[in-house]
């Protein structure tokens, strides 16, 4: 299993005090089905004591990409256009 973060995600995770250990643990939980599967290789996972949400893209079953992070208090969910964009990225 390989876990990657975009530059933007890494900066946001650091500012929200989310550790790499927590991110790796979240991937293991995602593999166990403890995340919301949004289709097309896109997953939504709760992080940091349920305060933040991460969008994770899965590629080939062993590569995972953290791409987007948002606080639940700032944004209730991603919209359908954003979801379509994440699905398109997950294809490539």
Task: For every predicted segment, state its role.
Residues 24-51:
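A short, surface-exposed loop/turn module that caps and links secondary-structure elements
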Residues 1, 40, 61-62:
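Sequence-level motif detector for i,i+2 pairs with an aromatic at +2
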Residues 1-18:
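Arg/Lys-rich, positively charged N-terminal/basic patches that mediate binding to nucleic acids
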Residues 54-58:
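Short, surface-exposed beta-strand/loop micro-motifs that present aromatic residues
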Residues 59-92:
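Enriched for short, Lys/Arg-rich terminal
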């Amino acid at each position: 299993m390989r876990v990657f973060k975009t530059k933007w995600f890494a900066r946001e995770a650091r500012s929200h005090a989310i550790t790499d250990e927590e991110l790796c643990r979240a991937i293991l939980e995602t593999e166990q089905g403890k995340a919301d599967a949004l289709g097309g290789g896109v997953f939504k996972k709760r992080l940091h004591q349920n305060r933040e949400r991460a969008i994770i893209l899965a590629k080939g079953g062993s590569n995972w990409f953290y791409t987007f992070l948002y606080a639940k208090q700032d944004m209730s969910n991603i919209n359908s256009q954003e979801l379509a964009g994440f699905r398109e990225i997950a294809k490539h």
